[in-house]
Amino acid sequence: MKKTIVLYLLCICHFHYSHSQAMSSKNYTYLALGDSYTIGEQVATRDNFPHQTVALLAKDNFSFQQPVIVAKTGWTTDELQVGIALAALDKKYDFVSLLIGVNNQYRGRDKAEYAQQFEKLLKQSIQFAGNIPEHVFVLSIPDWGVTPFAEGRDRKQIADEIDAFNSINKDLASKYNVHYIDITPGTRQANNDLSLLAEDQLHP
């Protein structure tokens, strides 16, 4: 995934907001949960957003261990649940991010099912963060409908469905008092600037 500057800056701002009194000498841990947008499809590991975020925070004298990433291309919410169950995860991390749902939309999965499964994932994320909601970040689903991959499809329908799924995850983020980072508008800029996409012309 190429740099999405707005995303990284927002991550940093939220980090400082929730940790303004933290000692910068601590070596923080970070768990990233998601799908292809999290692992960074067709980019080097160092260029995916969890590693980029840690690298930028390091420039501000915040030390992080390497991010722990549980994500796979094509995963839906239920598949992420299975992935988490199979992963040998520690019980607690300083920060957790959750970005999942594009494949639920792509496969035409039910929105009520998404809401139920996303809520469970969000509760797990909060538990992984030591039951500190302020240390959890939900990221909105990017809009793949603006990419060449969507050629011949109903782009407005895709956008409307992405918005509907994002309305669900945003409401749940608010319900559980976690941070919400809306990256969708930034991903829609690829409609006029394909340089924002990876080589597959799908992932930002």
PLM regions and their residue ranges:
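Bacterial Sec-dependent N-terminal signal peptides
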Residues: 1-25
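Serine-esterase "nucleophile elbow" of acetyl-processing enzymes
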Residues: 20-73, 83-91
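Residues in and immediately flanking transmembrane alpha helices
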Residues: 15-16, 48, 195
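Alpha-helical cap/lid subdomain in secreted, periplasmic
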Residues: 82-204
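Residues that line or immediately flank small-molecule/substrate-binding pockets and catalytic motifs
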Residues: 8, 34, 100
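Short acidic active-site motifs
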Residues: 79
